[in-house]
């Protein structure tokens, strides 16, 4: 389970005997965290599985199975919807592979390190301004190192999420000769 400590705390706080806990990430091969502080605070695994196309598909199937078990009357609907969603994601995956097959540049930079599964799935290299959990502001040293990385790897776009400070993304983009593109 990718979010075990968080899920257990939430379930205990709910104090609801009828609550069904779904391990949406069951069967996933997790991206392991390497920063000891992040592991201590958040657990051993990157929780952003849904940002992988295959991870999102797996989670949808696990959720559908749990819903079907809890609500057998509508089980077929849950399962069909999950299969349809998985098929749509498979189309996206094939298109992504086709569109990036000849890409010489495999590096990208984001506001926070949420795309580890996507990077793993498609042989990409992710760098980020902030850590996996978008906590704290980056140091000037970190921004300088990222700017150097961007120039070396010809990274022309810094992807910035809503949760991350736009100032850091703008500063990095200016230093690296790149542009900032918002992602949601």
What kind of region is each of these model predictions?
Residues 1-184:
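Extracytoplasmic metal-acquisition and chelation regions
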């Amino acid at each position: 389970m990718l979010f075990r400590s968080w899920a257990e705390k939430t379930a205990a706080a709910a104090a609801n005997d009828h609550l069904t806990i779904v391990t949406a990430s069951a069967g996933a091969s997790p991206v392991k965290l390497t920063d000891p502080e992040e592991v201590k605070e958040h657990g051993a695994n990157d929780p952003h599985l849904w940002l992988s196309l295959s991870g999102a598909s797996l989670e949808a199937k696990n959720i559908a199975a749990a819903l079907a078990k809890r609500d057998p009357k509508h089980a077929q609907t849950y399962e069909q919807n999950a299969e349809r969603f998985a098929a749509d994601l498979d189309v996206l995956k094939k298109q992504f592979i086709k569109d990036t097959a000849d890409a010489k540049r495999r590096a990208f930079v984001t506001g926070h390190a949420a795309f580890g599964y996507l990077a793993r799935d498609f042989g990409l290299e992710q760098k980020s301004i902030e850590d996996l959990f978008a906590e704290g502001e980056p140091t000037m040293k970190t921004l300088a190192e990222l700017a150097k990385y961007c120039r070396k790897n010809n990274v022309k776009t810094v992807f910035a999420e809503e949760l991350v400070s736009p100032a850091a993304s703008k500063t990095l983009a200016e230093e690296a000769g790149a542009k900032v593109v918002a992602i949601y």
